Regions:
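N-terminal chloroplast transit peptides
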Residues: 1-39
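C-terminal beta-strand-rich structural cap/linker in extracellular carbohydrate-active enzymes
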Residues: 253-257, 929-955
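Short proline/glycine-enriched turn/loop motifs at strand-loop junctions of beta-rich domains
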Residues: 90-97, 211-218, 252, 896-898, ...
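Loop/helix patches that line or flank the sugar-binding groove of alpha-linked glycan CAZymes
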Residues: 686-890, 895-912
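The feature marks proteins involved in alpha-glucan
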Residues: 39-83, 98, 103-207, 229, ...
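Substrate-binding/active-site clefts of carbohydrate-active enzymes
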Residues: 330-335, 339-351, 362-370, 375-533, ...
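Active-site-proximal helices and loops of the catalytic beta/alpha 8
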Residues: 387, 391, 542-689, 693-695, ...
Length: 955
């Protein structure tokens, strides 16, 4: 999800030269900062999320009203059993006493100020030395808690299966405090496990392995088929050191099973008998009702040529050569009449040979897009796997309604939880393809069809990226049928606050990758997708909520894969994600997390929200009319009060600084001249709230983007922020201008599907559950989907007064000619990017040595960006030669609504000409870009990005 580290793009620039530092104060109405997930003022204690993954679609067992009486101790788990020998608790026992109580049958109660109903009562003594350094490192948020020693002869392995309470008593014996315990630390200490998990197949046997150290009893209920009411066998598993196992005949393969687990669950204070899928499931029945026993190595599940697919994958010489196109599986084909109806909206649509969508993808691949990023394709909640259960919209009715009607959204929202659409950020099981995208959600069909999709995309020239959501779970607790991990080992897989309730900052049911077996599950899951499905990259949703250690370990494990040993080349697998730093993990509160600033130097990419916000203006949660570099700030005002013309001029200059840092791959140490005339590093350019703009150590750690599935589409946000009176031609040029800046930036460019064809969602800012109607992509290029009704009320109603007149105005809607020109222009910029390695420099040193910005400093034109990249010459000292064709590239961006003429005297010796691709472009406007070699004088048409090159002369 594409949100910001800061709540707005930066409006101030700082430098280490304090005497020369430039400070810029925003008008107060632009300074309002909000928590980006709750949209509440920062400092608010509310955790009610208003985010695209609406918590209406998720369930959590974390809620409890605050109470303070010792009588209510069971509602809380405020103590931490951090290791075999230590319990941490922030209670001063003093001269009193402290005891640990355990009940195998969850019968603890407080009667007459005394804990009763226990099977074990253990006296604890405080360790005055406090918590060890290792404990403080693993649990930094409780580093100041007191340490209580656990007797060395205690049978801890059996004790953790019980209901546990720690109690403190006054010297007179009166109960002072009592609470439950969080036991992830001691589970890691005693039960960390490296052996097999899930179903393991051999020639003669199938063995089940389940990690469940707190379970009292585990049985596997085996079913012949996905819907039979009675199991054909119930198998009791045996436990060894927290791992439960059972072995059966090979005939189990192809059957279904669920686990029946008896386990204490703190959320209900009871021993619960729960029914759950295998956390390591590799197959499922429809809607994940049962785990399917499938051997992914079976030849029957391999498309023809599957084992040789690594040899067919498109070449990847460097991660710097990557460009990413983000696409939802259903969006691609649900409304494409050229796709066989049985394939529409599913995996097999990508295997169609000549559909409109496939023809479109072929053009993008030929132009340079290397990686296709698919929104979640694991088993998620919110969409039934069986299509006959879906409710479908009446498109004929919807098409009859006016473009600004609220009728369309009313019709869609009435069925939105029962249709076939959801983005999929509601994870149930991470390691199984989503059943609703398969022809048959039962059996092995989803596995085979997913593999066919990957194979087809590789053969089209794309490497495949999966969107993985390891930061939260759709459900928790013992009763929700979509709850899995929290049923098996209650309270372990989820991150809990100091009261013991589940953290919800991501939306709900935050996971805890700081726990050993959570990290292991994540890495094992990645290995499954990489090895068994031959996936080429992973995009981590809310990566900042995952520990840096987990991400680095995952990268190292994946990189170690080889074609000879594993059938894949792990060094070609690229990892990137959302490095936002917020919630309970902010500022390393739970350990070093994988935030933007923390992952630099790892080679893991993170989304650059700085360039996005500077280009568009404001932030996704600011006022929708706040303008930015490409949406008319200062140059085409829309009437919004930014604080006056001088303020707008400064804002535009600072936004330009941020864009230039982003175009230099957002490198911390890249040196440029800022709008105040000072030479500063990228890390010394700051947002208005003091956050460094740059964070990367090498170019592949920056993923530059201006739009993604979150928030409005690029065309929509441009249509919202630009003045109502400008023409649709200008809006289309701005759409192209914005994508060209991303394409010509160093680092990795990322594009949202449809950016290239002016895609609209009728100004829906959060279409995660808005159905096919608002999410349509038309690869026939007849419509961009603008003006199909007011967007859904839930997330957009406050903007309806702004949206309604725009949708009603027919002049806002692009015609087919606009869409076709936009596509041609997008193809042009991709081809230009891949025409020279100078636009894809591989190291920070190369960028620092070769890339320069002109038209900088206080007297510069803030509406013009001029970037040059210089190459060396073979056999001459200085820079090495990278490009055999061009020795110099100049990119000029003009966001002004008029021609821009200027001179750069230092370029007079350069024999520059417009790039051949632009000289032959279908864009007649860009052909008007000129350069006078004798004077160094340029003339650039309005709202355009011109690329000039100096060709090498043969000697």
């Amino acid at each position: 999800m594409s949100f910001s580290l800061s709540s707005s793009f930066s409006f101030s620039t700082k430098t280490t030269h304090l005497s020369d530092s430039i400070r810029f104060s925003l008008p107060s109405h632009l300074k309002v900062r909000t928590n980006i997930w709750t949209r509440r003022p920062l400092g608010s204690s509310s955790i009610s999320p208003l985010r695209r993954r609406s918590c209406k679609c998720c369930s959590s067992m974390s809620a409890a009203e605050p109470v303070s009486s010792p009588q209510d101790y069971i509602l809380y788990s405020r103590a931490y059993w951090v290791s075999r020998t230590v319990i941490a608790w922030n209670v001063n026992v003093g001269d009193g006493s402290c005891f640990l109580y355990a009940s195998k049958y969850a019968s603890l109660l407080n009667s007459d100020d005394e804990i009763q109903g226990y099977h074990h009562k253990i006296k604890l003594h405080e360790d005055t030395a406090g918590l060890s350094a290792n404990v403080k490192e693993k649990f930094p948020h409780i580093r100041d808690y007191r340490a209580f020693k656990v007797p060395s002869d205690l049978d801890v392995k059996n004790l953790v299966k019980c209901q546990l309470v720690i109690a403190a008593y006054q010297p007179n014996g009166q109960l002072k405090d009592a609470t439950g315990l969080q036991i992830a630390g001691v589970l890691d200490d005693l039960f960390s496990y490296h052996g097999p998990l899930g179903a393991v197949f051999s020639k003669e046997f199938v063995t089940l392995y389940l990690w469940a150290p707190t379970a009292q009893v585990v049985r596997a209920c085996l079913y012949q088929d996905p819907s039979s009411s009675s199991p054909i066998e119930v198998i009791k598993l045996d436990e060894l050191n927290g791992v439960w196992t059972a072995t059966g005949p090979k005939s189990w393969e192809g059957c279904y099973y669920v686990y029946e687990v008896s386990v204490y669950h703190a959320s209900t204070s009871q021993i619960e008998k729960v029914i759950a899928n295998d956390p390591y499931a590799r197959g499922l029945s429809a809607d994940g009702q049962r785990t399917f026993l499938v051997d992914l190595s079976s030849d029957a599940l391999k498309p023809e040529g599957w084992d040789n697919l690594p040899d067919e994958k498109p070449p990847l010489h460097s991660f710097s050569d990557i460009s990413i196109y983000e696409l939802h599986v259903r969006d691609f084909s649900a409304n494409d009449p050229t796709v066989p109806s049985e394939f529409c909206g599913g995996y097999l649509a990508f295997t169609s040979q000549d559909s409109a969508g496939i023809r479109h993808l072929k053009r993008l691949s030929s132009a340079g897009i290397t990686h296709l990023h698919l929104l979640p394709t694991f088993q998620f909640a919110g969409v039934a796997d069986e299509r006959d259960k879906w409710k479908n919209a009446d498109n004929q009715l919807l098409e009859s309604l006016p473009p600004d009607s609220d009728g369309q959204q009313a019709h869609i929202t009435a069925i939105q939880n029962d249709d076939g659409y959801n983005w999929g950020y509601n994870p149930v099981l991470w390691g199984v393809p989503k059943g609703s995208y398969a022809s048959d959600p039962n059996g092995s069909c989803r596995t085979l069809e997913f593999r066919k999709m990957v194979q087809a995309l590789n053969r089209l020239g794309f490497r495949v990226v999966l969107d993985v959501v390891y930061n939260h779970l759709h459900a928790s607790g013992p009763s929700d049928e979509k709850s899995v991990l929290d049923k098996i080992v209650p309270g372990y897989y989820v991150r809990r606050n100091t009261d013991g309730h589940i953290e919800n900052s991501t939306c709900t049911n935050n996971t805890a990758s700081e726990n050993f077996m959570v990290e292991r599950l994540i890495i094992d899951d990645l290995l499954c997708w990489a090895v068994d499905y031959k996936v080429d990259g992973f995009r981590f949703d809310l990566m900042g909520h995952i520990m840096k250690r987990t991400m680095v370990n995952a990268k190292n494990v994946l990189s170690s894969l080889s074609k000879d040993a594993n059938g894949v080349e792990g060094s070609d697998i690229y990892l990137y994600g959302e490095g936002w730093d917020f919630g309970e993990v902010a500022k390393n509160a739970r350990g070093t997390n994988a935030s933007q600033f923390n992952v630099h130097g790892t080679g893991i990419g993170s989304f650059n929200d700085r360039i996005r916000d500077a280009l568009l203006g404001g932030s996704p949660f600011g006022h929708p009319l706040q303008q930015g570099f490409v949406t008319g700030l200062l140059l085409q005002p829309n009437g919004y009060d930014h604080g006056g013309k001088e303020v707008e001029k400064k804002m535009l200059a600072v936004a330009k600084d941020h864009i230039q840092v982003g175009m230099a791959a957002n490198l911390k140490d890249f040196v440029l001249t800022n709008c105040g005339g000072q030479e500063v590093k990228g890390s010394e350019v700051y947002s208005y709230d003091g956050i460094s703009v740059a964070y990367a150590s090498n170019p592949t750690e920056t993923v530059n983007y201006i739009s993604a599935h979150d928030n409005e589409t690029l065309f929509d946000i441009i249509s919202l922020k630009t003045p109502a009176g400008i023409s649709v031609d200008e809006r289309c040029r701005l759409n192209h201008l914005a994508t060209s800046i991303i394409a010509f930036s160093q680092g990795i460019p990322f594009f949202h599907a449809g950016d290239e064809i002016l895609r609209s969602k009728s100004l829906d800012r959060d279409s995660y559950n808005s159905g096919d109607w608002f999410n349509r992509i038309d690869f026939s290029y007849n419509s961009n989907n603008w003006g199909i009704g007011l967007p859904p009320k839930e997330k957009n109603e406050s903007n309806w007064p702004l949206i309604r007149p725009r949708l009603a105005d027919v002049s806002f809607k692009p015609q087919r000619s606009h869409i076709l020109l936009a596509l041609e222009n997008f193809i042009d910029v991709l081809q230009i990017r891949y025409s020279s390695p100078l636009l894809r420099l591989r190291t920070a040193n190369a960028i620092q040595q070769r890339l320069r910005f002109h038209n900088t400093g206080p007297s510069s034109n803030p509406g013009i960006v001029v970037m040059s990249i210089e190459d060396g010459h073979e056999g001459l000292p200085g820079l090495s030669q990278l490009d055999p064709i061009y020795s110099y590239i100049l990119v000029i961006i003009n966001v002004q609504p008029t021609d821009s003429s200027f001179t750069i005297p230092t370029l007079r010796p350069r024999n520059l000409q417009l790039h051949p691709i632009q000289m032959n472009s279908t864009d007649e406007v860009i052909k008007n870009s000129t350069y006078d070699v004798s004077t160094g004088h340029f003339c650039i048409p309005p709202l355009s990005t011109a690329v000039f090159v100096e060709q090498r002369t043969s000697e």
